[in-house]
Amino acid sequence: MELGKKDELSENLFLVNSIQQVYIHTQLKTMGLNIQQSRALNYISEHSGTIQKELVNYLGKQKATVTNVLKALEERNLIVRRVPEHNERQKQLFLTAEGAAAVQQVQQIFVDIEGKINAGLTKEEHAQLLNLLQKVKATLSTDED
């Protein structure tokens, strides 16, 4: 099979994903963040007081990698780690005011990319595309099993 010909759909999905990733990466870079740091901030925002183990599971990364992500965020005063009274072995993770502001900026990046995607679609096309992409995702997900 020649890419771009018989595999036109997969080629276009790949290109759209690549364009989206470049956009997100570029926007995060202006904030001094990478994708893992932004995902960690978002998770901590949604799960205030979470522990590192839960973040490791969410990110799907090794503990050492997540430790480095957290160190970088802590050095930039975006998060704080606190030892709870009842368990001195596990530190809870919380956003600082600066971290909360960064989360808002990160979320705006995704709002902006969603707006760019929707700009070229009618409401009906949006709904149809979303439905079709969910079908493709479900089909590909069952292939992983």
Where are these regions (language model features)?
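Short alpha-helical elements of helix-turn-helix
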Residues: 7-11, 31-42, 53, 67, ...
